[in-house]
Curated annotation (Swiss-Prot):
Cofactor: Fe(2+); Ni(2+)
Enzyme Commission designation: 1.13.11.54, 1.13.11.53
Top-level division of the source organism's lineage: Bacteria
Keyword list, A-Z: Amino-acid biosynthesis, Dioxygenase, Iron, Metal-binding, Methionine biosynthesis, Nickel, Oxidoreductase
Protein name: Acireductone dioxygenase
Record site feature (May play a role in metal incorporation in vivo), residues: 95
Cofactor binding summary note: Binds 1 Fe(2+) cation per monomer.
Organism: Methylococcus capsulatus (strain ATCC 33009 / NCIMB 11132 / Bath)
Amino acid sequence: MSLLTIHPESGTSAPEIIREGDAIAARLAEIGVLFERWQAGRAFEPDAEQQTILAAYADSVERLKAKYGFESADVISVGPDHPQKDELRARFLREHTHSDFEVRFFVEGRGLFYLHPGDRVYAILCERGDLLSVPSNTRHWFDMGAEPCLKCIRLFTTAEGWVADFTGSDIGDRFPRLEDYLKHYA
């Protein structure tokens, strides 16, 4: 189940909790973020190649490319046995921005996005079928969990793909990791 919690950036008071998909989409639209529920009915082997996953969703990827001018797409696929899962998690947990507009479509698994526009932090638990945009220059971080299980198509407006500009902030340390978030809010 997708979930949105909205926190003051201090992280010191109880958040607003939103569980219904249309309400999540409406609140995120207020900050320029697209949230949609898509069909993600295809099953993949744990070691499925990026091209296999992109080919399975080629029509959807092409529609998004045409609509938003995306130049590239890739797949982040991380399971509990991934040899670099700890390094990837540590990198994604650091607050950063991107100079381009990006979209994420979860085709398997889940992950926790934190968006930090202004003085609020929006935590979005994304699961299979969720599509989420990250507007350009929006401070954010992502937690895939200690035992990740996700396949996510990422679309970029630049050919370079995922290029992060890390802010140097430790704000991510003040908010719960995926496992604690699930215990408290899910």
